[in-house]
Amino acid sequence: MLDVSPRAPSPVDEVPHTLDEPVPRTLGLLDQLGLWGNLGVSLLGFTGAVAVLHPGGPDAPPLSLLAALLATVVGTALGSAAIAATAALGARTGAPSMVLLRGLFGVRGSAVPTVLNVVQMLGWGTFEIVTIGSALTQVVPGVPRWTWVVAVGTVTTLLALRPLGWVRVLRRYVSVLVVLALGYLLLAVPAPASSAGGWSGFSTAVDTALAVAVSWVPMAADYARHSRSTRAAALGAFVGYGVLQVSCYAVGLVAAASGDVFAVFLAVPLGVVAFLVLVGRELDQSFANVYSTTVSVQNLRPHWDRRVLSTVVGVVTTGLALFVHMDDYAGFLLLIGSVFVPLTGVLLTDRVCLRGAGWDLSPTAAARPLMLLPWALGIAAYHLVPAWASASLVSFLVAAAATAAVHVLPQTRPTQEVSR
């Protein structure tokens, strides 16, 4: 039987080994800006820019560069606001994201989104390792892809064992290099010769950019709970993630309009150096997914040691990355949006309707099965809206309105007002 009990007390400046230990509050505004800024820049973001530019698929007419950039700004701004709002809740309560859902659904009910989030995070972690491995194969073509995948998976797992320590490294060193590399590519990548394309598919492009941002909502509180203040958590998430994702997509859109994204980067002078900086930075995305998968599992098993869980998750994502390819990435993004956009609407609306009353985040939190109804309605709305409408916005509004309606019914409030 797997022994997941802690062997020694957690260090006071690092994430506790279990959910039963005190939560250190060591991250300031610069730490949060560094973390979320780095999460906003991704090799997958460059791939996502292709999906924004071609919302109808590679064989459909593309958006114009202006339309694609505007879709990126709108989707990113909405998604960053959702991240910031969830981060504020995490900083205020000291609870990770899936534990917050105990207040929304009760302990048993929170298992449903927790399992879905574990699946999502395993998917993201796998895609990140695949992306890094594929990128390194282009830079050093003589090394087999599987070698890079195993190496990246190993480093990812090691970083996930000391997440707060790695956040401090991001803030002090990596963020500066990333900004310089991104700025250089933005100036060096040649602009496309023409502005072909239109506005057809604009709402789908918004949903694609929004889905990438919203995919981070289920992990926002995992780091925000370590913030010294609510302001640092919310502002760091909104500004750091929003500005850097838009910048990342802008570079990707220009490159995608000119040809293969990675090939365009490598063709410019010093492009290999800038590209390698971004490849190395990608490790923060992969380790963040491994860590948040671990914390999500701890919502179901609070006493399990996160070090053991992170090791297991790292091995699983690395194993999957040996066989997974990027063909279904765009579909994966839209599926994520259909689940987590309405969940965010339910979460934030429920908090507002409670008028500041505390959620019951304890291991005995009572079930609130009615709150699953607005979430289900939001998911249905996402898949039923016509193609010209924004599925993300409609599903969020439907879920939020249904949550507000549920609050006029009896027994929708948590039976206790305590925070973990």
PLM regions and their residue ranges:
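Membrane-interface "cap" regions at the ends of multi-pass membrane proteins
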Residues: 1-65, 201-206, 218, 225-235, ...
